[in-house]
Amino acid sequence: MAWLDPLNAYPLPADFASKAEAYSTLLLTYNKTHNISGAKTTQAVEENILDSLYPLLFMEAWPNRCIDIGSGAGFPGIPLALALPQMEVHLFEPIAKKSAFLHLVKSELGLTNVVVKTERIEATEAFPCALICSRAVTNTKALLSLAKAFITPTTCALLYKGSRANEELEGFSNYTLFERNQRRYVLVKELM
C-alpha cells in the first residue's frame, strides 16, 4: 500500500496493512451514523494512521504497556496496537459512542493487546504505565496531572501536539520535539 511508504524504515507486522484497511472501513462506516471523527474519507483515515505511527521512526524502544488518554476514534492507540502487537494498549474514552466503536474495532480485528475503558483516566484504578500517549485532549500540564497516578520514575509521555507545543512545554526540561507537517510530537521523559 503506497500510503504506508513513509513508514518503510519500520518493520510493520505482516497483517498490518489488512488490519489498517479493516479499521479504516469500520471507522468510515460507523462515522456515517455516529460522527465520532473528522476523518470522512479513506485518505483522511490513512493520514490519521500515518500521524499516529510517525513516532515509530524516532522512538528508540517501545514499552510493554501504554495508555492512550482520550482515544476518540482510536488515534493514536489503535494504529499503535496494530503496529506493536507485543505492547498492551489501554484506551481511555469516556464518551459512550466512541468507546463502543473502540470495542467494535477490538473485537472485529481480534486485538488481544487492547483494553478499552469507558471512563475518564482520573476515575479508574491506576496501574504502573511506561508510556502515556494522547492526541488533542488538553494541554500538557493538565494531561500529566490527570494521569499522575499512572506515572512511575521511568514513565514517558508521547504527546501529539499542534503548533503551540513549545508554549505548553515551558517548565519541562527533559523532552524532545519532532515535527511532521503541522504536527509536533513531544517525547517527555522523567515525568516525576
Language-model features and meaning:
Residues 41-42, 50, 83, 126, ...:
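Short capping/connector residues at structural and topological boundaries
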